[in-house]
Amino acid sequence: MKRRSPIFRMMVLLLGIALLFGGCAPEFSQNTQGNSSTLEAMAPTVTPSASHFPVQSETPAEPVTVEGEITAVRRSSFTLLLEDGTQLTVIPSREHMEDDELLQGNRAQVIYCPQERQENQIKALQVTVTVPEAYAQVEKLLDTMTLEEKVGQLFFVRYPGKKAPEEEARYQFGGYILFGKDFQELTKGEVAAQVEACQKEAKIPMLMGVDEEGGTVVRVSLNPNLRETPFPSPRELFKQGGLTMVTETEAEKCQLLKELGINVNFAPVCDVSQKEDAFMYSRSLGQNAQVTGDFVRETVGVYREENVGCVLKHFPGYGENGDTHTGVVVDRRSYADFLEEDFLPFREGIRAGAGCVLVSHNVVTCVDDEKPASLSGEWHRVLREELGFTGCVITDDLVMGAIQDYCDASSAAVQAVLAGNDLLCCSDYSTQYPAVWEAVQKGEISEDRVEQSVRRVLRWKVALGLL
């Protein structure tokens, strides 16, 4: 075989380099204009070969522009939700990932090279982030609020019955959660009137929530005046008619809640449970992680279309564990188990644009073997960084047995804020509000920390059309 000369081999190498950079692979430069931050790409430079042979390269593909809503923001990428429901994973430059405006709900225009697209992952040539005007008003509203009002916004409390309007006028709570007895024997008009009475006392419109999962956990549809029969569980509906029947029922559920003035449902249950004797099985879809993830994604889509808030629960996932209502539950599964199974439905819900995630009281040892997840800063870091969630994080009820066995109610509320929760779900606000207020007054909880959470709460209210 004839041996090729070194000059010939060099020319082949140069030809390969020219072809490699003949597409639209960018270098990056930063450009900021007005309220939009822009990341621009410089055209690649290719030095012509000194060879006598002409260098041939493919004509670069025209860049493609897409626009959508930012949902999840991870360390080196973010999710862009397009109008048709497509979810794109966008990989921008390192500099742009540090942009403070890269938040759930903001808009982004992304320019990318179609040659470098891998399924639904794109490498950005340019990213322009825009803050919708409604979100821009949040900062102005924060400037007008007293510190007491800001602390009040952190509380999503148990509806206190007839004195609910009076208590809202006093504390300016972020929201009320209603239970079955709050709807007993009432008509739709009577429920709506009670809710409206509370909203009239609120300087900032309230989140009004219920647990209307379907099946064993229903608050509204237990009352035959509000629905002829209680909503079935998603697990039962899925067996009967797949995801189509599930989403149709969720849409009906949203319509009923809106008639009553309820704007948040503490659902869907994202826990993966397939053992019939497990505590969470009857409330879960009863399917594997992939199918549960599909259910969560589709359900979140329905709630967004209906403009009703939903809450992904119970992060990081119960699995087949016991009941935290009655005492401490310890989960000793590996972190790999959570990555491969439990995180998947939460990740799907976050990427689909869910505005809130509820954190359970399980002690999950692979990340923190001392504190319940709800009070663990480490677990909140995982939720923010690993799953990319920038929306509201809420505790499970702070009077549940798992918390009472760990610490007292007042301490739990303070620890919950310090851990990173934005909203405290509590039935004992007369104890927990003063504890948080005192911690703020003493500087144990900084005003900056309070504002960080209030900002997220207000942004969620904007997303729901309350502001």
Report each predicted region and the residues it spans.
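Preference for extracellular/luminal or secreted protein segments
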Residues: 2, 25-31, 40, 133-167, ...
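Bacterial N-terminal signal peptides that target proteins for export
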Residues: 2-11
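C-terminal motif of bacterial Sec signal peptides marking the signal peptidase cleavage site
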Residues: 21-23
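Short, flexible, surface-exposed loop segments at domain boundaries
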Residues: 28-83, 98-133
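A short macromolecule-binding patch
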Residues: 86-94
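Short, well-ordered coil/turn segments that N-cap beta-strands
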Residues: 152-153, 174, 203-208, 262-263, ...
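Enzymes and membrane/adaptor proteins characterized by extended Gly/Ser/Thr/Asp/Glu-rich
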Residues: 169-292, 314, 319-332, 360-375, ...
